[in-house]
A protein has these predicted regions:
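A mid-sequence interfacial segment
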Residues: 98-115
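Polybasic, low-complexity binding patches
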Residues: 49-54, 62-103
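Histidine-centered nuclease catalytic patch
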Residues: 19-54
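Short, charged surface segments at domain edges that flank catalytic/cofactor-binding sites
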Residues: 1-24
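A periodicity- and composition-biased signal for non-globular, repetitive helical segments
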Residues: 10-15, 66, 113-114
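A general structural-boundary detector
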Residues: 12-15, 43-46, 78
Length: 115
């Protein structure tokens, strides 16, 4: 259950819907079907982050597969910064060719698995 102020903040930060009324993922620029919507904290909650953006589930999982919470807090506090990450750019080019409701299991990057 959310309070009135949190609902207003969330509504103000929601991505602009397209003609079909679906929000648009700020990473891949595709409409997000209701069952594929995930809230992503730009700065992880464990690091004091409050602001969220609505992402495709597959995009959200890819962000966390590639980056640690420390990296998200330090270097990737904005969507534009996430889009500029080299591995994320490669992923976004690939996922843009998929249907809006496409989902595939995401694995941690080898760099993160080695930690």
């Amino acid at each position: 259950m959310q309070g009135r102020i949190k609902r207003k903040k969330a509504a103000a930060q929601a991505p602009e819907p397209r003609g079909d009324g679906l929000p648009v993922c700020p990473l891949c620029d595709r409409p997000i079907p209701p069952k594929q919507q995930d809230a992503h904290h730009l700065v992880p909650r464990s690091r004091g982050g409050l602001q969220t953006v609505c992402l495709h589930r597959i995009c959200h999982r890819q962000v966390h597969a590639l980056l640690t919470e420390v990296e998200l807090e330090r270097d990737y506090r904005e969507v534009d910064a996430l889009r500029q990450h080299p591995e994320m750019m490669r992923f976004l080019a690939w996922v843009r060719r998929k249907p809006d409701d496409f989902f595939e299991r995401t694995r941690k990057s080898q760099r993160l698995r080695g930690r």
